[in-house]
Amino acid sequence: MISRHLQNNLMSVDPVSSQAMELSDVTLIEGVGNEVTVVAGVVVLILALVLAWLSTYVADSGSNPLLGTIVSAGDTSVLHLGHVDHLVAGQGTPEPTELPHPSEGNDEKAEEAGEGGGDPTGEPGAGGGVEPSLEHLLDIQGLPKRQAGPGNSSLEAPVRSEDSTCLPSSPSLISVRLKFFNDTEELAVARPEDTVGALKSKYFPGQESQMKLIYQGRLLQDPARTLRSLNITDNCVIHCHRSPPGSAVAGPSSSLAPSSTTEPPNLGVSVGSLMVPVFVVLLGVVWYFRINYRQFFTAPATVSLVGVTVFFSFLVFGMYGR
């Protein structure tokens, strides 16, 4: 009796247990247990975190030997450059260090000459071997001092040397810098008595009517004016402009002429001004076909035509209603 009762109880509980066993037997991946899948997922997650941390890791400059060598090389280059600048600066001002030596040598020679105890034939020979080099050194060092005045700076000396090479030796000639609008210059040599027309014909032959000379904001229109009367002195800058042949100014009388004679009429047609009339004509033609041949126009086409017309009307009123 007891065995039968237990068997009946097992039979009654069997459906639930069978469903639980079926659910427990279901795996995420067929052929692989759920435990293996969970462990593999955890390992992959840990690897992803480690890789993400390594990708954001930045090594210190002190721990990287390559970066340290680069920085050290850069420091040494800076030090070398500073040493070179110091040497150049030392070579640029040799007067305070070298000038006392010749003076001491001259004092010693004066003392030896005053004593007169040495060999008269040997001492001049020895002094003659050293004295020319010292005098040559003194001449080289004293030359810049004689050339540079007390009020001149170190930057004015190269400019004056360049001017001395460009300027002629004759005092009656002056040099004028002709500067164009494209930053090119030309050095012109003329006399103060030369006129503007002579300057144009000398340096711009055949282009006198096209060239415009501007000095201190003034247009040099009178070709009979001399350079002296215009206060054009040595090393002055005159700006030159080459105008097109059609709009060239011949002289002061041509500036008084009406603008229609100097400027050609604008015969070109502006395409932008014709856009609105052409678009109006196209809209009118489309509306004509819409009214007379309405069977060829569908409802979306009619709505689009109305929208384009309204938009164009607002655009035209916005442009010409100001």
Curated annotation (Swiss-Prot):
Residues 174-247 form the Ubiquitin-like domain. It holds the Pfam family ubiquitin. It is found in: Membrane. Coiled coil: none annotated. GO terms for biological process: ERAD pathway. Keywords: Membrane, Transmembrane, Transmembrane helix. PANTHER family: PROTEIN C7ORF21 (PTHR14557), TRANSMEMBRANE AND UBIQUITIN-LIKE DOMAIN-CONTAINING PROTEIN 2 (PTHR14557:SF4). This is Transmembrane and ubiquitin-like domain-containing protein 2.
